[in-house]
């Protein structure tokens, strides 16, 4: 079932069933709209990381940093989002946040598991 409601000029609301949301024909953002916080993070990681062990390391960092909360804000440092990025923007989706975190992790640590090892030692990454 698909229902599109247009309000005014710029807002379009599309409702899809959970089964439709898993269809590869839909954009990742639309598919994520029916997922809970943890599922969104898992889905975003899976778009970028193929290795199961690396995905698990990434997921562990996300949980420790924000409990999968995409709107999390550290008032002391200004870091925000699932990954607590210092350069994160409040309007970024979980997918965008994860893309940015992935670039950072590959640049700084080479792998998510190396980043997680560092995180375990220092409680930041």
What is each of the regions a protein language model found here?
Residues 1-36:
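N-terminal prepro-regions of secreted/extracellular proteins
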């Amino acid at each position: 079932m698909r229902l599109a409601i247009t309000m005014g000029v710029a807002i379009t609301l599309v409702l899809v069933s959970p089964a439709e949301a898993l269809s590869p024909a839909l954009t990742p953002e639309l598919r994520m709209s029916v997922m809970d916080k943890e599922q969104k993070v898992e889905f975003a990681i899976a778009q970028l990381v193929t290795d199961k062990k690396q995905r698990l390391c990434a997921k562990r960092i996300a949980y420790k940093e924000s409990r999968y909360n995409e709107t999390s804000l550290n008032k002391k440092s200004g870091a925000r989002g699932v990954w607590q990025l210092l350069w994160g923007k409040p309007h970024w989706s979980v997918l965008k946040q994860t893309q940015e975190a992935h670039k950072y992790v590959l640049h700084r640590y080479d792998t998510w598991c190396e980043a997680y090892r560092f995180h375990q030692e220092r409680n930041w990454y």
